[in-house]
Amino acid sequence: MAPGSDMHSLDALVQALRRLPGVGVKSAQRMAFHLLQHDRQGAEVLSRALHDAAQSVRHCARCHTFTEGEVCSTCLDPSRDASRLAVVETPADQAALERTGAFRGLYFVLMGKLSPLDGIGPKDIGFGKLLERAGDGVVQEVILATNFTAEGEATAHALSETLKARGMHVTRLARGVPVGSELEYVDLGTIAHALVDRR
């Protein structure tokens, strides 16, 4: 992988970079070579930032998103509409909804989606915790804002069936979001319209 057989640190860096989504061997090598050849100070800053984030960022006790405290600032915000709960797959999806400014409710972040082929079932993405949160007596509407991929649709369907069976009002983002897309890559106007036109 790296030139020479004594480059264990470089090989380890390339392998670590390959763990990032969408990064293959060549991209990882380019990044590693760039950091070591042109930006050693940037490499140190990146290393410290990764270490600090890994040590201090955890899951919110209420919504499961990332936070440095026990409970995230969104869950603690008294101006939020606690009667509306948007269910998203990832913190990136939550951030995409927040950037629209069209949603002032609260969130529940699944940290994944159902994927039976990969062995990911309801327990793996916090169905139980979501049911507890949605059934707290405060939540009046659960908005399913999972992605419009096959797994996201399956997750939304399973959640919808389970929540409706418990007498909860469930809506889904409108189809203004293109099928096969992921929220963090959709333009803000489309997301805002999808929220307003949800069914």
From Swiss-Prot:
NCBIfam families: recR (TIGR00615). The keyword Zinc applies. This is Recombination protein RecR. SMART domains: TOPRIM (SM00493). GO terms for biological process: DNA recombination; DNA repair. InterPro entries: DNA_Rcmb_RecR (IPR000093), Rcmb_RecR (IPR023627), Rcmb_RecR_Znf (IPR015967), TOPRIM_dom (IPR006171), TOPRIM_RecR (IPR034137). It holds the Pfam family RecR_ZnF. Keywords: DNA damage, DNA recombination, DNA repair, Metal-binding, Zinc, Zinc-finger. May play a role in DNA repair. It seems to be involved in an RecBC-independent recombinational process of DNA repair. It may act with RecF and RecO. It comes from Paracidovorax citrulli (strain AAC00-1) (Acidovorax citrulli). Belongs to the RecR family. The keyword Nucleotide-binding does not apply. Residues 83-178 form the Toprim domain. A zinc finger (C4-type) spans 60-75. GO terms for molecular function: DNA binding; zinc ion binding.
